[in-house]
Amino acid sequence: MAVISMKQLLEAGVHFGHQTRRWNPKMKRYIFTERNGIYIIDLQKTVKKVEEAYNFIKQVSEDGGKVLFVGTKKQAQDSVKAEAERAGQFYVNQRWLGGILTNYKTISKRIKRISEIEKMEEDGLFEVLPKKEVVELKKEYDRLIKFLGGIRDMKSMPQALFVVDPRKERNAIAEARKLHIPIVGIVDTNCDPDEIDYVIPANDDAIRAVKLLTGKMADAILEGQQGVSNEEVAAEQNIDLDESKEATEAETTEENTSVESN
């Protein structure tokens, strides 16, 4: 069974590309035709590419890896946050701050500041500090949460990046490529597919299209996690069986010893 159907893609408007005058020739192999000055994406290829991306992301998840979702354009912000949280992953849905991947040591200090301000409030310091200072601290906290809240629990580099619109997220892609982190991306007809390891040719401007495809990547992660959970359960069951076997053997030995002594 296919990961995604042609009907789902059509209903979400995934097939609508950009105007023919705004295109990247490298996307030619993913274009089906042109209609009223708009390129139409070949959805048969999209179905295949979604499946390839899905299987890759699922494997990353099965291996215990994490995926960083990146989508800072308005059409992607809500879906990126919601689907990343649903799958228990990291996300950046506001401005990409330079160094999130390549200078994480500095970024992590700013993330630490979030916890520091939270502790100040928990300890009651906000009640004794001057009102003006408290207002400034709250502004600082809101700003940090806005830009770094989605990666505050990211203690190490992600094993994959999922991006919506490579043109918009070129800084994130540059950092990921520098660190050899595989990239999955929703790539429209005006983008360069060569920058992406797992290309999903699709409309990156329609909210429904972005939501559908981002949701599929979250589904892949959850399916991969289910595989990990099943393996853990099986391992625990094997341990229980081994312990049960050892206990049974011990009981048998005791019974034999008792019989022999009698």
UniProtKB/Swiss-Prot annotation:
GO terms for cellular component: cytosolic small ribosomal subunit. Residues 228-262 are annotated as: Disordered. SUPFAM superfamilies: Ribosomal protein S2. It comes from the Bacteria. Belongs to the universal ribosomal protein uS2 family. NCBIfam families: rpsB_bact. This is Small ribosomal subunit protein uS2.
